[in-house]
């Protein structure tokens, strides 16, 4: 079923302290006396599945499933151009920003935050007011010479960022009880997913249109061509429902095979398993971006990875109620597509030296089972190597969006778990 939710925002401790509310949410404000949330999520991804179950005898099973899913995954948010930041908790609007420079303003803002709810939420009416008095003419609009569009150019809009998936896959598992003490399972799967990343104008907030240009490139470069998000339609005028900003697909394909052998003895059970996988992912750009005109549109280079994994484990029965369990595994896996690309919204370029992650893991535990009480104590350890750490943020000194990536990141998780 479709899911629509309003999202809470993350604020700094100063905001929570001033409001006296640890659940303070900066994402909403009053419009015409009614609450409106700028951060809404929209999720609707139906799935269709066909399964076949084959059991030729009591010791054999062969199950196969074919599935298809598609849908919408969107999240709305405010965007603005040549205008003040509309977020009430923007750090320059907080009292602490003026603590050492303007004592009177510092005290006034503290009082406003404590007593005036409107001062700490989005001012929707002000956004509509700003958009309604910004008459602007776009010359050669949409790349058509002599085409002039005149109207109120929105300084603020509500946009929806989308990541709409289409996924098709098949899974097949064959299971055979070889005898009273041995069991074999083998299987394979194939998955293909294409995710469409783009954004649309959800609400012009009282304006007539939005001009589809990169505001950071527009500020940093004198060449207006560089600031065009769509070089095939320069000076693109967009209205409600139109796609703008970025528009591309990420395709992923995975072929996997696996097997597991299990053996039982009187006081012990053990298993070994292995898997092989071949994966590939690539980008397809739908627009030619002004920053990277030769590396943004069309099908990009495929990134291929071959991976494998092995595992083993067992249980030793000390008595009928006390057990020792141990497991160990090694596997390699391809990097996630959301961290593999440098700036997928505007170009087809992956991080230099991209390679598979390696995962080592193991655990050993003691298990006790009584009729009314069950308990477990487990020591675990895992090490993940060659990860990619990726973050995007606005840099105040550089006055631009920064894509920050680190490669070769290792991570260790270890600890003790107790459960009763």
Model-derived features: positions:
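Transmembrane beta-strands of outer-membrane beta-barrel proteins
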Residues: 1, 62-66, 184-188, 270-274, ...
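Acidic/polar loop-and-plug regions of large Gram-negative outer-membrane beta-barrel proteins
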Residues: 2-51, 74-159, 223-238
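Flexible, surface-exposed loop regions and adjacent strand-edge segments
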Residues: 2-23, 79-90, 94, 200-211, ...
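Extracellular loop and loop/strand-boundary signature of outer-membrane beta-barrel proteins
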Residues: 33-38, 47-51, 155-160, 173, ...
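Residues on the lipid-exposed face of transmembrane beta-strands in outer-membrane beta-barrel proteins
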Residues: 48-54, 64, 170-176, 186, ...
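Transmembrane beta-strands of outer-membrane beta-barrel pores
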Residues: 68-72, 190-196, 265-267, 276-282, ...
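Signature of Gram-negative outer-membrane beta-barrel scaffolds
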Residues: 157, 183-319
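Outer membrane beta-barrel strand-and-loop segments of large Gram-negative receptors
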Residues: 167-171, 351-355, 361, 370, ...
């Amino acid at each position: 079923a479709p899911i629509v939710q309003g999202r809470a925002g993350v604020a700094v401790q100063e905001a929570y302290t001033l409001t006296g509310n640890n659940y303070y949410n900066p994402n909403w404000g009053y419009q015409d006396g009614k609450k409106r949330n700028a951060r809404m999520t929209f999720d609707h991804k139906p799935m269709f599945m066909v399964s076949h179950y084959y059991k030729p005898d009591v010791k054999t099973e062969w199950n196969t499933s074919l599935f298809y899913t598609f849908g919408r995954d969107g999240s709305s948010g405010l965007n603005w151009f040549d205008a003040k930041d509309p977020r009430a908790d923007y750090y320059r609007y907080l009292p602490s920003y003026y603590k050492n420079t303007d004592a009177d303003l510092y005290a006034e803002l503290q009082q406003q935050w404590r007593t005036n709810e409107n001062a700490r939420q989005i001012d929707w009416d002000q956004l509509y007011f700003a958009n309604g008095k910004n008459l602007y003419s776009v010359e050669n609009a949409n790349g058509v010479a002599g085409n002039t569009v005149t109207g109120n150019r929105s300084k603020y809009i509500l946009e929806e960022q989308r990541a709409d998936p289409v996924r098709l896959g098949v899974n097949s598992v064959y299971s055979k009880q070889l005898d009273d003490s041995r069991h074999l399972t083998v299987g394979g799967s194939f998955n293909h997913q294409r995710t469409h990343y783009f954004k649309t104008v959800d609400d012009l907030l009282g304006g007539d249109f939005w001009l589809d240009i990169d505001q950071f490139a527009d500020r940093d470069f004198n060449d207006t061509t560089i600031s065009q998000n769509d070089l095939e339609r320069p000076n693109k005028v967009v209205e409600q429902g139109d796609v703008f900003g970025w528009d591309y697909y990420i395709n992923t394909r995975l072929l996997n095979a696996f097997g597991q052998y299990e053996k039982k003895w009187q006081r012990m059970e053990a298993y070994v398993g292995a898997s092989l996988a071949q994966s590939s992912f690539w980008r397809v750009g739908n627009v030619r971006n002004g920053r990277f005109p030769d590396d943004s549109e069309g099908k990009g280079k495929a990134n291929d990875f071959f991976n494998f994994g092995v595992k083993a484990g067992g249980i030793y029965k000390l008595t009928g109620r006390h057990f020792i369990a141990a497991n160990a595994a090694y596997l390699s896996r391809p990097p996630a597509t959301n961290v593999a690309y440098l700036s997928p919204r505007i170009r087809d370029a992956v991080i230099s030296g991209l390679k598979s992650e390696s995962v080592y893991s193991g655990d050993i535990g003691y298990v006790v089972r009584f009729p009314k009480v069950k308990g477990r104590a487990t020591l675990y350890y895992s090490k993940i190597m060659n990860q990619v750490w990726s973050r995007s943020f606005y840099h105040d000194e550089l006055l631009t969006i920064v894509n920050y990536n680190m490669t070769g990141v290792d991570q260790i998780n270890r600890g003790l778990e107790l459960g009763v």
